[in-house]
Amino acid sequence: MATPSLRGRLARFGNPRKPVLKPNKPLILANRVGERRREKGEATCITEMSVMMACWKQNEFRDDACRKEIQGFLDCAARAQEARKMRSIQETLGESGSLLPNKLNKLLQRFPNKPYLS
């Protein structure tokens, strides 16, 4: 285990409650947060799409010969769309456990921090 440097030991020796690190900006919360990027969702229904395209290739791109595969792909796409819709509803209702950035910015604008220490 490394021992602290002489400079750090001397800084703590004079006043043990004084922090050793000196920030270059005051430690005050900002009045807004940055917009986070939405996570990219994973691709859905890849297997159904590949089965449908393989069927099209075998049957010279005739839809009537591949009705079962096309219907399977459309059903999977509809289920994925419903899942995305339910996830977005849960996020807007705040069931995810954290506030969205735009709601947090509105709260921070209503109760701004002082730009100075009092």
Curated annotation (Swiss-Prot):
Keywords: Disulfide bond, Mitochondrion, Nucleus, Ribonucleoprotein, Ribosomal protein. GO terms for biological process: mitochondrial translation. Pfam families: CHCH. A motif (Cx9C motif 2) lies at residues 66-76. A motif (Cx9C motif 1) lies at residues 45-55. PROSITE patterns: CHCH. Disulfide bonds join C45-C76, C55-C66. It comes from the Eukaryota. Residues 42-84 form the CHCH domain. It is found in: Mitochondrion; Nucleus. Its main location: mitochondrion. GO terms for molecular function: RNA binding. GO terms for cellular component: cytosol; fibrillar center; mitochondrial inner membrane; mitochondrial small ribosomal subunit; mitochondrion; nucleoplasm. The keyword Transit peptide does not apply. Component of the mitochondrial small ribosomal subunit (mt-SSU). Mature mammalian 55S mitochondrial ribosomes consist of a small (28S) and a large (39S) subunit. The 28S small subunit contains a 12S ribosomal RNA (12S mt-rRNA) and 30 different proteins. The 39S large subunit contains a 16S rRNA (16S mt-rRNA), a copy of mitochondrial valine transfer RNA (mt-tRNA(Val)), which plays an integral structural role, and 52 different proteins. Belongs to the mitochondrion-specific ribosomal protein mS37 family. This is Small ribosomal subunit protein mS37. It comes from Homo sapiens (Human).
